[in-house]
């Protein structure tokens, strides 16, 4: 009998898969977008705003991986204002350019131009849509499908809808356009304004459409998923945390999806949009500004972040191999840093080897670990120095900085009112349990949370008898972190042991083992060993999983040994 133990244990991958580096200027104008040509060059479009006349589009080319740019053409129409340029390269090598073209509030067009000579000359081809106002047409975005071409755009021309996102399909390379499809619209109409659409095909074959929703928060960013890029669920999609206004999305071959917006932060998803994390280091330190950013996969291991700020500029980043999270994970903050932690709101500091959350009158949290951690034991030493409550979060996904309960997670903490509290945060607070205990100010308490499936045991001071035992299955996986609510608190000796992510599944048929797992295999290998050691030591058995029905799948020959261990490990 063959005994197969699938660990996947602790070998999940550390955050920030991009290391930002050099910058370059593309053009002195505004609103930049790019496209990769079939010969390896890149083409860019930028808006030029000359004094005393209407704006026009400048076309630029780079032959050295986007480092240097030369203007080669312009597209200009007398009496019309042009902006929001968008490029796409067709399978036959032709390049299409679309844009918004308007005369005040009386004429709106989305014209299409074609170039057959690498962008040096342009010929009018067609018009996607038109409006005589006052509702306008804005921000077109192309998508090449298997045998057709799609375009998405913001549309103000429908009565009863402040704005919606329209889609049209061309079956002849942009010469003619089919009937309008409503990709995103407020159910029943109203004042909400979905717009600025961007779409990309992910590594699992599905398409993700991202967009802003003006009059919802600060132009909150949301997304929809489609298997064919033409069939869309109703409504306004699913919110993406930490991003607002003017989103842009791209996907890389490894499976990671990257997203940015006018927050000028970059978020990434390793599970095709189900959960999102924010990079600790942004490409540009602009804060929230109307920079109309974009992201491009400019090389096999390179991501470029484009912003319009003092001209159109690019910053290049290396897609770096992600180091494995250690098991156990531990941080005592003795170095006076919180490397590998991501801060959300709040005020942070360090003193005497402790992590300070100085949040009297406010709130804040800091997160670390893998978004795929599921079971394990979380511990910390906690001292609260002003009235309020503080504690730990776990199984957190989609964290945001828009309030004390922004994210999806469990929270266990101590309150100086004299109790331990356990609850759920899902952009709102839902209390599960409390138990009375003495919580004195300026006194250190040791907390321990043991999580196994839907069972949670919460310990404080006494590590033998849990103060709270509770069953709840709301959240299955996520990061860990520390949180302070309306108080100053310090944390020390944070640890997470026996970390287990979502399961590595295995099926055995006809002498073959087939492993599947639901997240992106970025720089990982499947490892195997006949004996367990600490740390795990083994040999790689394969490196090239494939996508089958949204699961990463990797077949290997059934081993001869009677006992075999398998796990995923960072390269």
Residue locations for each model-derived region?
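Secretory/extracellular carbohydrate-interaction modules
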Residues: 359-425
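Extracellular glycan-recognition surfaces and repeat-rich motifs
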Residues: 334-366
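Short tryptophan-centered beta-strand motifs in secreted/extracellular beta-sheet-rich domains
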Residues: 333, 378-380, 443-452, 456-460
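Short, solvent-exposed beta-strand-to-loop segments that form ligand-recognition rims
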Residues: 460-479
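Asp-box/BNR beta-propeller loop motif
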Residues: 16-22, 60-72, 113-126, 169-181, ...
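Short, aromatic/His-centered strand-loop micro-motif at the edge of beta-sheets
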Residues: 425-446
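Short, composition-biased motifs enriched in small/polar/acidic residues
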Residues: 498-571
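Hydrophobic core segments of beta-strands in well-ordered, beta-rich domains
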Residues: 33-51, 84-104, 111, 139-161, ...
């Amino acid at each position: 009998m063959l005994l197969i133990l699938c660990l996947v244990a602790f070998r999940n991958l550390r955050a920030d898969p991009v290391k930002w580096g050099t910058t370059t200027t593309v053009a002195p104008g505004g609103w930049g977008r790019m496209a990769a040509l079939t010969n390896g060059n890149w083409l860019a479009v930028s808006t030029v705003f000359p004094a005393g006349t209407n704006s026009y589009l400048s076309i630029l080319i780079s032959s050295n991986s986007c480092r240097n740019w030369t203007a080669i053409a312009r597209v200009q129409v007398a009496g019309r204002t042009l902006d929001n340029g968008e490029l796409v390269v067709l399978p036959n090598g032709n390049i299409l350019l679309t844009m918004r073209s308007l005369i005040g509030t009386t004429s709106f067009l989305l014209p299409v131009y074609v170039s057959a000579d690498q962008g040096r000359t342009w010929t009018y081809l067609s018009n996607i849509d038109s409006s005589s106002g006052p509702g306008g047409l804005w921000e077109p975005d192309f998508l090449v499908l298997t045998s057709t071409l799609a375009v998405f755009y913001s549309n103000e021309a429908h009565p009863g809808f402040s704005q919606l996102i329209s889609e049209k399909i061309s079956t002849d390379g942009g010469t003619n356009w089919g009937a309008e499809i409503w990709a995103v619209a407020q159910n029943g109409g109203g004042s909400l304004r979905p717009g600025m659409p961007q779409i990309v095909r992910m590594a699992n074959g599905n398409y993700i459409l991202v967009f802003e929703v003006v009059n919802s928060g600060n132009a909150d960013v949301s997304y929809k998923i489609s298997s064919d890029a033409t069939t869309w669920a109703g409504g306004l999609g699913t919110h993406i945390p930490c991003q607002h206004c003017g989103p842009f999305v791209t996907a890389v071959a490894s499976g990671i999806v990257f997203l940015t917006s006018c927050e000028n932060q970059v978020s990434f998803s390793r599970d095709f949009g189900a959960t999102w994390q924010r990079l600790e280091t942004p490409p540009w330190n602009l804060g929230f500004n109307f920079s109309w950013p974009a992201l491009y996969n400019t090389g096999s291991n390179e991501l470029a972040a484009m912003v319009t700020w003092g001209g159109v500029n690019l910053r290049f980043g290396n897609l770096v191999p992600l180091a494995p999270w250690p098991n156990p994970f531990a941080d005592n903050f003795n170095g006076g840093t919180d490397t590998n932690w991501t801060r959300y709101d709040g005020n942070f500091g360090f003193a005497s080897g402790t992590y300070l959350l100085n949040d009297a009158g406010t709130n804040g949290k800091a997160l670390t670990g893998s978004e795929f951690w599921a079971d394990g034991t979380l511990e910390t030493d906690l001292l609260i120095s002003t009235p309020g409550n503080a504690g730990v979060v776990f199984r957190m996904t989609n964290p945001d900085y828009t309030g004390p309960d922004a994210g999806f997670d469990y929270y266990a903490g101590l309150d100086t009112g004299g109790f331990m509290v356990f609850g759920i945060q899902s952009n709102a607070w839902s209390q599960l349990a409390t138990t009375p205990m003495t919580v004195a100010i300026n006194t250190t308490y040791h907390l321990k949370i043991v999580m196994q499936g839907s069972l949670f045991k919460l310990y404080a001071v006494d590590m033998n008898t849990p103060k709270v035992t509770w069953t709840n299955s709301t959240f299955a996986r996520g990061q860990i972190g520390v949180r302070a609510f309306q108080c100053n608190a310090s944390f020390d000796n944070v640890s997470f042991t026996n970390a287990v992510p979502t399961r590595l599944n295995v099926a055995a048929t006809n002498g073959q083992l087939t492993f599947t797992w639901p997240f992106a295999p970025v720089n990982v290998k499947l490892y195997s060993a006949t004996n367990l050691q600490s740390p795990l030591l083994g040999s790689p058995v394969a490196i090239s999983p494939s996508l089958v029905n949204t699961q990463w799948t990797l077949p290997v020959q059934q081993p001869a040994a009677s006992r075999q261990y398998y796990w995923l490990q960072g390269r």
